[in-house]
Regions:
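Short glycine/proline/serine/threonine-rich loop/turn segments at secondary-structure transition edges
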Residues: 1-8
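Aromatic-Pro/Gly-enriched surface loop or interdomain linker
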Residues: 19-101, 132-134, 155-156, 240, ...
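Enriched for extracellular/lumenal, surface-exposed ectodomains of secreted and cell-surface proteins
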Residues: 10-18
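Catalytic beta-strand/loop cores that center a nucleophilic Ser/Cys/Thr
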Residues: 148-246
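Short amphipathic C-terminal alpha-helix that caps PH/PH-like domains
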Residues: 248-260
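A glycine-rich, often tryptophan-bearing local segment used as a flexible ligand/cofactor-contacting loop or short
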Residues: 103-185, 248
Length: 261
C-alpha cells in the first residue's frame, strides 16, 4: 500500500434492510446524567514505511500509564518488559537495547535501586535510552554524566514547531530510516517536555527546536558514549506519538534503537 492515512467505514444491515453506520457511546461522569452519543463507525489506518534494525531483544522499563511497549511491539520490535527481578538479577547483556519509559524513575523502585547495573550494562557496550524524567531523576544523579532541568522545565508545546537537525550526517538520521522534514509532520499535542537545560560536555545535542517567540532549545535529544556503549536522554514525547501512530516518531525511535558506538 502507498504510505498515508486511510479511513475505513463500517456498517451493518439488518434483516429488514435498515442500515446502521453509527457507533453508540455513552458520556458518563459523576456530575452529569449518562448521555448516549452516536458517532460514525470509522477507524483510521496509517500506512508507513518503518525499517527496524536487526534486534532480537529490547528490554523496556515501563513508566506510569505508558503504552509505548505495546506500540513498539505492534510494528515488530521484540520487547521484553523488565520487572524488579530482571533489573536486580537478570542478565541485561542479552538485550541489544534497554529503554526506560517516561517517569519510570519515580514509579519503579527496582530501577532506582539497580541503576548502577544499568550503567554497567551501557559501559559494557549496551544501548540505554532514557525518556523524559522529572526532578527526582536529576536529584538522584542517575545519569552517567551531569544533567540539569530548568524550573519550570524546558518544553516545546507546539507540535508543529520547526526542528533543526544539528548534525545532518550523523547515522541517527540515516540508519535504518532516512529522517526528513516529513517525519516531523503530524505530531500530536507537543514536541516534548522535560528537556535537559544544562549538560556535561560528554553529551552531544542532536536536535534544536523551540516554541514561537521562545529561545532555541537543544536539550531534547542528547547522546553520550559511556564506556563501550551509548546513553541517550530524550524529552521527545514518544509516549504520545507512538500510541497515536505518528510515522515519523516510529522511524526516529527505530533509528535510536540502531545507535552504536
Amino acid at each position: 500500500m502507498t504510505p498515508g492515512s486511510f479511513l475505513v467505514r463500517a456498517a451493518a444491515t439488518g434483516g429488514d434492510g435498515r442500515r446502521c453506520d453509527g457507533a453508540l457511546g455513552i458520556i458518563d461522569y459523576p456530575h452529569i446524567r449518562p448521555r448516549p452519543v452516536v458517532r460514525p463507525s470509522t477507524v483510521e489506518i496509517r500506512v508507513a514505511r518503518i525499517l527496524l534494525p536487526a534486534l532480537t531483544r529490547v528490554g523496556y522499563v515501563r513508566g506510569p500509564a505508558d503504552r509505548e511497549p505495546e506500540a513498539l511491539a505492534a510494528v515488530g520490535v521484540p520487547i521484553d518488559l523488565l520487572g524488579a527481578d530482571s533489573l536486580a538479577r537478570g542478565n541485561l547483556s542479552r538485550y541489544e537495547a534497554i529503554v526506560i519509559g517516561g517517569r519510570a524513575y519515580e514509579t519503579e523502585p527496582a530501577l532506582v535501586a539497580n541503576n548502577g547495573r544499568l550503567l554497567d550494562y551501557a559501559r559494557a557496550g549496551g544501548l540505554v535510552i532514557v525518556q523524559y524524567q522529572q526532578y527526582p531523576f536529576i536529584q538522584g544523579g542517575f545519569a552517567p554524566y551531569p544533567l540539569s532541568l530548568a524550573r519550570p522545565h524546558d518544553r516545546v508545546t507546539d507540535e508543529d514547531a520547526p526542528v533543526t537537525v544539528l548534525d545532518p550526517a550523523h547515522p541517527l538520521f540515516h540508519v535504518p530510516n532516512e529522517i526528513g522534514p516529513a517525519d516531523w509532520q503530524g505530531w500530536v499535542q507537543e514536541r516534548g517536555l522535560y528537556f535537559a537545560h544544562d549538560w556535561d560536555s560528554t553529551y552531544t545535542p542532536r536536535l534544536e527546536m523551540h516554541d514561537p517567540g521562545d529561545p532555541p532549545l537543544r536539550g531534547g535529544l542528547l547522546v553520550a558514549h559511556v564506556g563501550r556503549g551509548v546513553y541517550v536522554y530524550t524529552g521527545l514525547a514518544f509516549f504520545r506519538q507512538l500510541p497515536a501512530g505518528v510515522p515519523g516518531a516510529y522511524r526516529l525511535f527505530a533509528n535510536l534503537l540502531a545507535l552504536r558506538t
